[in-house]
Amino acid sequence: MVSTDSIRQSIQAGLACERVDVVGDGQHFQAVIVSSAFEGRARVARHQLVYAALGDRMREEIHALSMQTLTPAEFALRQHG
Protein backbone atom coordinates (compact mmCIF):
# COMPACT_ATOMS: atom_id res chain seq x y z
CA MET A 1 0.00 0.00 0.00
CA VAL A 2 1.22 3.49 -0.85
CA SER A 3 1.70 5.84 2.10
CA THR A 4 1.14 9.58 2.18
CA ASP A 5 4.73 10.01 3.41
CA SER A 6 6.17 8.14 0.42
CA ILE A 7 4.16 10.29 -2.00
CA ARG A 8 5.29 13.46 -0.24
CA GLN A 9 8.92 12.31 -0.33
CA SER A 10 8.71 11.46 -4.05
CA ILE A 11 7.27 14.88 -4.88
CA GLN A 12 9.90 16.66 -2.78
CA ALA A 13 12.71 14.62 -4.36
CA GLY A 14 11.65 15.61 -7.88
CA LEU A 15 10.42 19.17 -7.36
CA ALA A 16 11.68 22.01 -5.18
CA CYS A 17 8.74 22.62 -2.83
CA GLU A 18 8.11 25.01 0.02
CA ARG A 19 5.31 22.78 1.31
CA VAL A 20 3.73 19.42 0.47
CA ASP A 21 0.70 18.13 2.37
CA VAL A 22 -0.74 14.75 1.36
CA VAL A 23 -3.75 12.92 2.79
CA GLY A 24 -5.38 9.75 1.56
CA ASP A 25 -6.58 6.21 2.13
CA GLY A 26 -3.86 4.21 0.38
CA GLN A 27 -5.40 4.42 -3.10
CA HIS A 28 -6.97 7.88 -3.38
CA PHE A 29 -4.96 10.92 -2.33
CA GLN A 30 -5.29 14.69 -2.09
CA ALA A 31 -2.25 16.94 -2.11
CA VAL A 32 -1.52 20.62 -1.58
CA ILE A 33 1.81 21.43 -3.20
CA VAL A 34 3.45 24.84 -2.87
CA SER A 35 6.40 25.55 -5.16
CA SER A 36 8.09 28.56 -6.75
CA ALA A 37 8.46 26.36 -9.85
CA PHE A 38 4.75 26.95 -10.49
CA GLU A 39 5.27 30.69 -11.07
CA GLY A 40 3.90 31.73 -14.47
CA ARG A 41 2.60 28.24 -15.29
CA ALA A 42 -0.97 27.17 -16.02
CA ARG A 43 -2.60 24.52 -13.85
CA VAL A 44 -2.00 21.76 -16.43
CA ALA A 45 1.72 22.59 -16.60
CA ARG A 46 1.93 22.61 -12.80
CA HIS A 47 0.31 19.18 -12.61
CA GLN A 48 2.72 17.89 -15.26
CA LEU A 49 5.65 18.92 -13.04
CA VAL A 50 4.17 16.90 -10.17
CA TYR A 51 3.47 13.90 -12.41
CA ALA A 52 7.09 14.04 -13.62
CA ALA A 53 8.30 14.05 -10.00
CA LEU A 54 6.17 10.98 -9.24
CA GLY A 55 7.28 9.18 -12.41
CA ASP A 56 6.11 5.58 -12.77
CA ARG A 57 4.47 5.64 -9.34
CA MET A 58 1.58 7.61 -10.84
CA ARG A 59 0.84 4.85 -13.34
CA GLU A 60 1.65 1.84 -11.19
CA GLU A 61 0.86 2.61 -7.54
CA ILE A 62 -1.32 5.68 -7.19
CA HIS A 63 -4.87 5.19 -8.41
CA ALA A 64 -6.11 8.74 -7.90
CA LEU A 65 -4.41 12.00 -6.93
CA SER A 66 -6.18 15.32 -6.74
CA MET A 67 -3.89 18.32 -6.42
CA GLN A 68 -3.91 21.95 -5.49
CA THR A 69 -0.71 23.37 -6.99
CA LEU A 70 0.07 26.82 -5.64
CA THR A 71 2.86 29.36 -5.75
CA PRO A 72 4.04 30.64 -2.35
CA ALA A 73 2.12 33.90 -2.94
CA GLU A 74 -1.09 32.02 -3.83
CA PHE A 75 -0.73 29.86 -0.74
CA ALA A 76 -0.18 32.92 1.48
CA LEU A 77 -3.34 34.53 0.09
CA ARG A 78 -5.35 31.41 0.93
CA GLN A 79 -3.95 31.35 4.44
CA HIS A 80 -4.54 35.03 5.17
CA GLY A 81 -7.32 35.85 2.70
Locate predicted features.
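C-terminal structural segments of small proteins and small subunits
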Residues: 51-81
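N-terminal first-folded block
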Residues: 1-27
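Short, non-transmembrane amphipathic alpha-helical segments
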Residues: 7, 11, 46-58
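Residue-level signature for short turns and capping positions that connect secondary-structure elements
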Residues: 27, 36-38, 72
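Solvent-exposed beta-strand sheet faces enriched in polar/charged residues
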Residues: 23, 32-34, 68-70
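A short acidic, often aromatic-flanked loop/helix-cap motif at beta-alpha or helix-coil junctions
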Residues: 28-30, 75-76
